């Protein structure tokens, strides 16, 4: 006859859900023994333990409408779908179905509450929303001078001049824009730099030369010239040893 074919295995179990305003999470580990000799698998043994956690909190609640629903600049721009804008704006402005726009968060007017800045595709203005005391927001994109119409993917708030407020570095289609904050959320252009090699997508900051001010590093994506330039992906699309991306850029801050 055939040899006995028994197999031991371990199963990790994790269930989570909400019912009657209570969040329940069940975690456990099961030890199983199966008989594989017959035509159908037979479970010979199961043992293990479970842990159940109950909580009245534990999930995020969508408050987009309650915090931004009364802001006309928000509803008119963000409540419309992608098809609405791609069907009305020229691709030459920089709009694309690919997206990849990010959100930057910082206290830009020094009132102790975080505000948010939303990058937008070309042809649509970036939006700066100031958080008020009741949890709602007001649009200050135009008043702050940050309503760029250039295609934008990434932004970073960082104190570049060590004056105690959050300045803005914005990565737009052609390069970067550096904006000085007056401490009350009003921005003035300090500098702009073209990035000829590639389009900027994200920005990070650190004092890499340990001179007391923050430098910044710009991560880029598609190369600009030649056949590799494309709105969505570089060509070809390698799955390993990728070397067809755009060149990143490191900027040293000399305090001026």
What residue spans do the PLM features occupy?
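Beta-propeller-forming repeat regions
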Residues: 1-256
């Amino acid at each position: 006859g055939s040899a006995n074919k028994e197999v031991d295995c371990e199963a990790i179990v994790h269930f989570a859900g909400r019912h009657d305003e209570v969040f329940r999470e069940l975690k456990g580990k099961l030890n199983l023994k199966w008989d594989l000799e017959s035509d159908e698998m037979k479970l010979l043994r199961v043992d293990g333990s479970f842990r159940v956690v109950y909580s009245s909190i534990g999930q995020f609640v969508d408050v987009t409408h309650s915090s931004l629903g009364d802001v006309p600049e928000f509803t008119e721009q963000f409540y419309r779908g992608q098809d609405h804008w791609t069907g009305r704006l020229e691709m030459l402005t920089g709009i694309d179905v690919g997206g990849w726009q990010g959100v930057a968060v910082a206290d830009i007017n020094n009132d102790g509450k975080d505000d948010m800045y939303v990058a937008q595709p070309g042809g649509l203005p970036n939006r700066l929303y100031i958080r008020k005391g009741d949890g709602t927001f007001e649009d200050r994109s135009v008043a702050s001078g940050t309503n760029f119409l250039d295609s934008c993917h990434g932004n970073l708030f960082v104190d570049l001049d060590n004056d105690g407020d959050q300045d803005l570095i914005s990565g737009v289609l052609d390069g970067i824009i550096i904006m000085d904050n007056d401490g009350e959320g009003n921005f003035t252009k300090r500098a702009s730099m073209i990035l000829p090699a590639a389009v900027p997508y994200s920005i990070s900051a650190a004092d890499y030369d340990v001179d007391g001010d923050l430098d910044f590093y710009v991560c880029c994506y598609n190369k600009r010239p030649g056949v590799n330039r494309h709105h969505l992906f570089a060509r070809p699309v390698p799955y390993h040893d990728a070397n067809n991306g755009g060149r990143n850029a490191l900027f040293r801050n000399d305090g001026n």
